[in-house]
A protein has these predicted regions:
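Charged boundary/loop elements
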Residues: 1-10, 17
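A polyanion-binding, active-site-adjacent surface
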Residues: 11, 18-167, 174-177, 182-184, ...
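Long, solvent-exposed, polar/charged low-complexity segments
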Residues: 215-218
Length: 229
């Protein structure tokens, strides 16, 4: 079993090592490790420390197609959850439900569909989903997004530097902060300034992404948003 120290050092970030080697030596990253250790020991967080970096373990950066960065606190057992990949059918997740509604409208003409709430099928297709805060307070308060700002900015800047043709979806004011790091000429950007149900349901990005992938790479590279893989 991976222990706390290994997790904080980024065991689940192994696939992303080429982007993080020097970053791990910064004072910021050292402080981030202490923050995670102390938060875990004092039970400040509402999610397991072993799952903080889970999205990075699930997505191979060399296969990356889409980055969705959101700041809506995902609901897990009545408390805000830092990211989406470890959601399950028996936990309410308001944002996943809203995104699901949007995809049903775009691809299923509003009909209900079978939906993988864990979003593992998306991860396998190169869709990385991050929250502006990878940890949230066990009290349900939005306290930590500033702690994660430099980490998320580093990830985005490294992706922009190393890859072109990535589709970046920003959902919420805090997430749009990272838009300034994107070179729109070589990537694609989609914004939802207020990720409320109505605005996201009418959000056409998922269909637009597939349209551009079809034009650039062919049908076999399109994201299957609606079905299990």
């Amino acid at each position: 079993m991976v222990n706390l120290n290994e997790t904080v050092l980024g065991t689940e970030l192994a696939k992303w090592d080429k982007y993080l080697d020097n970053f791990r030596d910064t004072n910021y990253f050292k402080k981030l490790k202490l923050f995670l250790k102390e938060g875990s020991r004092s039970k400040k967080f509402n999610t397991s420390i072993f799952e903080v970096f889970k999205p990075f373990d699930m997505v191979d950066p060399s296969k990356l197609k889409v980055v969705i960065l959101t700041d809506t606190k995902h609901i897990h057992g009545g408390l805000p959850y830092g990211k989406m990949y470890n959601s399950s059918f028996d936990h309410e997740n308001q944002e996943i439900e809203t995104i699901k509604d949007s995809i049903e409208l775009q691809f299923k003409e509003g009909l209900n569909m079978d939906f993988d709430d864990s979003l593992e099928s998306w991860a396998n297709q190169g869709v990385l989903i991050l929250n502006s805060s990878l940890t949230h307070s066990s009290e349900g308060k939005d306290l930590y997004y500033k702690v994660w700002r430099r980490f998320n900015a580093h990830i985005v800047k490294c992706l922009v530097k190393n890859y072109t043709g990535i589709h970046y979806v920003f959902m919420g004011g805090k997430s749009i902060y990272y838009r300034k790091h994107i070179k729109s000429a070589s990537n694609y950007v989609y914004n939802v300034s207020k990720p409320e149900k109505q605005s996201v349901v009418n959000f056409s990005a998922f269909k637009e992404i597939n349209k551009k992938i079809l034009e650039q790479n062919g049908e076999e590279f399109m994201i299957n948003w609606t079905d299990y893989q």
